[in-house]
Amino acid sequence: ECTKGGCTNKNGYIVHDKHVGDIQNRDTLDPPDLDYEKDVGVTVSGGTLSQRLVSTWNGKKVVGSRLYIVDEADEKYQLFTFVGKEFTYTVDMSQIQCGINAALYTVEMPAAGKTPGGVKYGYGYCDANCVDGDCCMEFDIQEASNKAIVYTTHSCQSQTSGCDTSGCGYNPYRDSGDKAFWGTTINVNQPVTIVTQFIGSGSSLTEVKRLCVQGGKTFPPAKSLTDSYCNANDYRSLRTMGASMARGHVVVFSLWDSNGMSWMDGGNAGPCTSYNIESLESSQPNLKVTWSNVKYGEIDSPY
């Protein structure tokens, strides 16, 4: 947690979602507990978190993982109120190829999770696509491979319904025609620090700015998210997202793959022209994304 004067370490936990691969509601199994490294390919060391592409649990292939930050008491999901704050992390995307999505995002999940498994077994997930049947507001700080990156706001007409599944996002390749930014200007073979600034106060969010820092240099993408950029004057406005963030969002780390990822890094969104995740999963199961140095606090805190 950071101020302009510096940062102090905060302790917490990571928990996996209730679903592991195709195995649902893991708390119903015997035993229900995970060996995170072996079963879901997740390793934590100090302030560093890695997610591996392929693992095996209960004899079944598990692709990727979805993880939530839990508070220091290990009782509730940690809630973050982002308006007027900055969220920063370093990520190593060097192994994340076409068709793989290394995502870091926030959703308005209930802090106590949901019954019957609660926080302990990763219950309570929701997002703007209503993936598990539960809808809520979602802010994608990063969805990316090493070919393209996008950040996107997804507001909803209410806290639990009517979500804007497409959202309003910014991808330098797609939206500025800057095909060199993510890959050349930013060397994706080296770790990069990504800074997201949520401009506003209280529950009033007016702009979301993005900076990338690498090799001692700061690279601002050409555009930030505003109501003007998004052409949003209804529920899709940043005002709606700001109110949601003021209630508190849970931070999610996700790694998944799909042959239908052209919306993110193919077509007009990126240079990928074909996808074969089955080949990737079999030939490079140990592909991983590594997140580190996660920071949250005052805008313009030390990167």
Residue positions per predicted region:
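A long-range scaffold signal marking pre-active-site subdomains of enzyme folds
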Residues: 1-137, 142-146, 251, 281-303
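Glycine-aromatic-enriched beta-strand/loop faces of beta-sandwich-type recognition domains
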Residues: 68-72, 118-188, 230-235
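Exposed beta-sheet edge/beta-hairpin loop segments within beta-rich domains
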Residues: 77-83, 165-190, 240-244, 281-283, ...
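Secreted/processed peptides and extracellular or luminal domains of membrane proteins
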Residues: 8, 13-14, 162, 169, ...
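Aromatic sugar-binding interfaces of carbohydrate-active proteins
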Residues: 2, 110-114, 120-125, 131-133, ...
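Short, solvent-exposed loop/turn elements at domain surfaces
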Residues: 58-62, 148-150, 260-264
